[in-house]
Regions:
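C-terminal, helix-dominated tail/subdomain
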Residues: 185-192, 202-229
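Anionic, Ser/Thr-rich low-complexity intrinsically disordered regions
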Residues: 13-20, 77
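Helix-loop segments that flank and shape redox-cofactor active sites
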Residues: 37-48, 66-88, 167-179
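Non-transmembrane, amphipathic alpha-helical segments
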Residues: 44, 51-58, 149-152, 185, ...
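Active-site-proximal alpha-helical scaffolds that flank and shape metal-associated catalytic sites
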Residues: 20-21, 26, 84-185, 226
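Extended cationic-aromatic binding surfaces that line active-site or macromolecule-binding grooves
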Residues: 51-101, 105
Length: 234
């Protein structure tokens, strides 16, 4: 688990809600994966088709893990309001056919558009072992760590919309094998991620009462940033 970030408040004193949120956002400002050189190459059209395929193939492991970690979180929750709120995350990714295909299906539309065999993508046989290990570590984190930390680990969604906007614009401009339709996953996340992040942030700010709990939540965001970085070391 990532080292807990220090905050300029006396040890043991709980942070104010604003200080706590600032500490969470500082993790993203320093460690979110949008700063990795890979994304500059991807969005700038500097990768060949095979490299883009490798990224999408590898990333599918994460897409597959997301509804499983959300279901794991729901299974631990006694609060009906939180369960109801979190349930839509599972449906966002798994879909509710025929009207809502879901995020996993949208990712497969991307890999289809890149020329990858769908069954091969779903099998995850072509993904790096380190990627499979990392995403399963995320599922275990959400299943086993205190609930407040499990919720906090989702807060990288606070930082996601900007990278999605950059990706949509950059890939459409720079790759002739990318069309508007295959980027539907990222377009949908422009509205889903802020909604989810707003709820999770308020939940964490309300329920992390002690300084130790607050620091653990900040560390959980750092853990998730490390996970996302591991997915692009391909």
């Amino acid at each position: 688990m990532s080292e807990r970030r220090s905050v300029d408040v006396p040890i043991g004193t709980p942070l104010s809600r604003d200080e706590f949120e600032a500490a969470i956002r500082a993790v993203g400002a320093e460690r979110y994966h949008d700063k990795h050189p890979f994304h500059k190459l991807l969005h700038g059209g500097k990768l060949d088709r095979g490299q883009v395929q490798a990224w999408a193939l590898n990333r599918y492991c994460y897409q597959d893990a997301v509804p499983r970690k959300d279901a794991a979180l729901i299974s631990r929750v006694h609060d009906r309001e939180l369960r109801r709120e979190w349930l839509h995350r599972v449906l966002d990714h798994d879909g509710l056919p025929p009207d809502e295909p879901g995020g996993i299906e949208r990712w497969l539309v991307l890999t289809d558009g890149l020329g990858l065999d769908r069954d091969y993508v779903i099998s995850m046989k072509g993904a790096l072992p380190a990627t499979r290990f990392a995403v399963e570590a995320y599922v275990r984190f959400v299943r086993e760590r205190p609930l407040i930390e499990a919720v906090a680990s989702s807060l990288t969604e606070l930082f996601a919309p900007s990278i999605h906007r950059e990706r949509i614009a950059g890939m459409l401009e720079n790759y002739d094998f990318i069309s508007d339709d295959v980027l539907a996953y990222f377009k949908r996340r422009l509205t889903q991620a802020p909604r989810d992040a707003t709820f999770a942030l308020e939940y964490v700010k309300k329920n992390a009462k002690s300084r130790d709990e607050q620091e653990a939540c900040v560390a959980a965001v750092g853990f998730k940033c490390d996970l996302l970085l591991s997915l692009i070391h391909i």
